[in-house]
Amino acid sequence: MERKPLELESTDNHQNPSSAVYGGSVTAVDSVEEDVQNQKKVVYRGWKVMPFIIGNETFEKLGIIGTLSNLLVYLTAVFNLKSITAATIINAFSGTINFGTFVAAFLCDTYFGRYKTLSVAVIACFLGSFVILLTAAVPQLHPAACGTAADSICNGPSGGQIAFLLMGLGFLVVGAGGIRPCNLAFGADQFNPKSESGKRGIDSFFNWYFFTFTFAQILSLTLVVYVQSNVSWTIGLTIPAVLMFLACLIFFAGDKLYVKIKASGSPLAGIAQVIAVAIKKRGLKPAKQPWLNLYNYYPPKYANSKLKYTDQFRFLDKAAILTPEDKLQPDGKPADPWKLCTMQQVEEVKCIVRVLPIWFASSIYYLTITQQMTYPVFQALQSDRRLGSGGFVIPAATYVVFLMTGMTVFIVVYDRVLVPTMRRITGLDTGITLLQRIGTGIFFATASLVVAGFVEERRRTFALTKPTLGMAPRKGEISSMSAMWLIPQLSLAGVAEAFAAIGQMEFYYKQFPENMRSFAGSIFYVGGGVSSYLGSFLIATVHRTTQNSSGGNWLAEDLNKGRLDLFYFMIAGILAVNFAYFLVMSRWYRYKGSDDEVTTYETNENIIKQQDKNVA
């Protein structure tokens, strides 16, 4: 039968077969018409509400990053923790935040919706920043400062002090875990996804989102870190707490203007249904011409785009095979979703399953970023950080700003130079595909670690063979190598982020079903969480394996006695293998394609005939 375009109204001469069989109940066409009518009632204010959303995003990122960016130094300088202990805490904390995004996404999409989730999250972030501020401002909440002499007593924190600190970090886990998966999707909710201006607005919002993110990191890693390191920890932590309070005010000021999409129920239940039914029906023969003969149904007000059939993971197709035992409701809906699923449900599950191998490779990629956000700080502490002849010393944590600068600058170069150039070559509107963008980022990440290894080898050689610049507190001799040599590795990591991070976020957003976009945001951060825990595991394993070896501990407290360069080369090797794996998975992957413009008449007709045959 010839496929015909979807119409908003049915006529007497061209009636939906399901309407004839089921007595004129709600059909797919009626559902679309009702959906369009309901959509007109929604007032999309688009850019008019962006001052509230982007303003909240900016101050929220300034607050969180201002609190966390120098936390590594804070734990060693104020809480008197050893470097490896502090690095392990930071990795575990970052991983917990990232895994927390998955829980928040589930609660958001299932029960509360994005607005309510964000409301709780921004308040939790403020409380977390305030508690961390108190650990610095109240002397009883942190241990006494260590003496400057090498043999001076240096007491660690008490159990109560650690507990209070962890309470503040716990609030930040709740806050950041709720904000990260929901903020981007909530901003995109304010644009009409069906209009051309709305689609352009969503694309532009992605750029603004990452611009504010990098802007906040740059400002936090320069101004806020400088105040914390050179003026006062109390004042330096007051700034992000105040900014988080402003973020709360700005967010709630736009309360009556936002488009607030209600939670649509657990999408995880639909995934479980497809898997369970496919297992139950595993003995059935695969359907012939499955794009025609698999059962399909679109409920009223269905938000997701209608997906074309794909022939990957065909064992899942059996969940949508209609048998004589399967019962349908009068409107065509399965009577028991745990016995019969729709082809649409199956294709949505396929979308998620296809993403997982790509997500795994992207998670390994983040090993680069987690290491480039921690150990370069320790490298800078034992390098020459003087700027010019005026005696100004750049705070060690500030050097990470070059990662953000590299990312920010290259985003502009990518958008204004590379995309137009590649568009002429490939004919694609985006210049290159999303997977090509992610793969390029993984390549640059590997290169940044190789460069980091050579730079650390040079820094260590200078420290061991040339006059040094004194002793770093609780570390070792300060190498005469300028800390500016850290810029190449950090800039390459920034370029990697411009390719891979933005590419991943857009990839997940577009490849996940529409009712799982909070999950799409969370899976991006869960990947970062996996890499954080993997980074902690690698640090602990390398430390334990090498501390008693003849070559010495690679990750010694004094970097001059360690071999951080070999650690960098080891991770570069892991990423090289991961890059090869990603290339294989990219060739296998199939992008999600919608079939919204195709009528369901032919499919419905085949389904009815199939059921009648089964009943007979």
UniProtKB/Swiss-Prot annotation:
GO biological process, one term: phloem glucosinolate loading
Disrupted gene: phenotype observed: 48% reduction in total glucosinolate levels in seeds. Gtr1 and gtr2 double mutant has no detectable glucosinolate in seeds.
Keywords: Cell membrane, Membrane, Transmembrane, Transmembrane helix, Transport
GO cellular component term, pick one: plasma membrane
One Pfam family cited in the UniProt record for this chain: PTR2
InterPro entries in alphabetical order: MFS_trans_sf, POT_fam
Protein name per Swiss-Prot or TrEMBL: Protein NRT1/ PTR FAMILY 2.11
Tissue-specificity statement: Expressed in roots. Detected in shoots, stems and flowers. Expressed in veins and in the root vasculature with highest expression in lateral branching points.
Compartments where found: Cell membrane
Task of the protein: High-affinity, proton-dependent glucosinolate-specific transporter. Involved in apoplasmic phloem-loading of glucosinolates and in bidirectional long-distance transport of aliphatic but not indole glucosinolates. May be involved in removal of glucosinolates from the xylem in roots.
GO-annotated molecular function: glucosinolate:proton symporter activity
Entry membrane topology: Multi-pass membrane protein
Similarity section: Belongs to the major facilitator superfamily. Proton-dependent oligopeptide transporter (POT/PTR) (TC 2.A.17) family.
Species: Arabidopsis thaliana
Chain positions covered by the region annotation Disordered: 1-22
Transmembrane segments: 59-79, 87-107, 118-138, 159-179, 205-225, 233-253, 349-369, 392-412, 435-455, 483-503, 519-539, 566-586
Gene: NPF2.11
